[in-house]
Swiss-Prot record:
Organism: Hemiselmis virescens
Gene assigned in the entry: cpeA1
Record-given protein name: Phycoerythrin alpha-1 subunit
GO annotation terms (biological process): photosynthesis
Protein function: Light-harvesting photosynthetic tetrapyrrole chromophore-protein from the phycobiliprotein complex.
Mod. after translation: Contains three phycocyanobilin chromophores with binding mediated by both the alpha and beta subunits.
Amino acid sequence: MYTKAVLLAFVGSAAAFNAPMMTVRRDAIATGAAAAVVAPLLRPAGAKMATDSKAPLIELFDERDGCKGPAANKASDVGEPGLCVKVSMQKVAMNAAAAKSVATNYMRK
């Protein structure tokens, strides 16, 4: 009785094994590896890493205290009158003293 059950288990496991599936999977992995090798060569020449360290600088101008100047443009109805936001990209310089201060004061466990 047990031998028949073991024999049926072996036949069932052999039927579940699919050799062509293993070949397809192997081919897919090889194709993916080849694509990973070739991908850097296919990128456009204009796609380069930015080497200039620029970051957005946000300046807020508040004229709500009564400072009235000549209006060059018609005031919009969006937002709060008297507030202006200027965003520009500026080069960021390294500050070793500030980096050391952050490391000593904020990077503690």
